[in-house]
Amino acid sequence: MALTLDDHLEAVANVYRREMLLALTDHNPQFDRAALTYGSNQPLEDRQVALEMEHVHLPKLVDMGLIRWNRGEHEVKKGPEFEKIEPLLAVLPGRRNSLVDDQSP
């Protein structure tokens, strides 16, 4: 599947997907957030994020070919299409929490 600019923008539009992709630029592989926050003793918000990662965000990035995800090992690696999104990620390092909330001039 050839990814379009819209696909790349959709991939980084969510903070959790963006954080995972940015983390992979620094360290490949990563452990998925779901594995780290899935325990019942975690705050509800963390468990909700874990569920979103497992059922929405990581599968979306897999479908795009941007990551490879080994659910059993809770390991995320760069996918076959990852190099195509790297130029976009390169302009985001100072904006890991938001693309539009930065109020600096």
Where are these regions (language model features)?
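Short alpha-helical segments that sit at the start of domains
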Residues: 1-27, 32
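A short, conserved structural fragment
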Residues: 58, 62-72
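Short, amphipathic alpha-helical interaction segments positioned at domain boundaries
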Residues: 83-105
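Residues in the recognition helix of alpha-helical DNA-binding motifs
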Residues: 57, 79
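Short acidic, hydrophobic short linear motifs in intrinsically disordered regions
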Residues: 30-46
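Short, Lys/Arg-rich nucleic-acid/phosphate-binding segment
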Residues: 71-76, 82
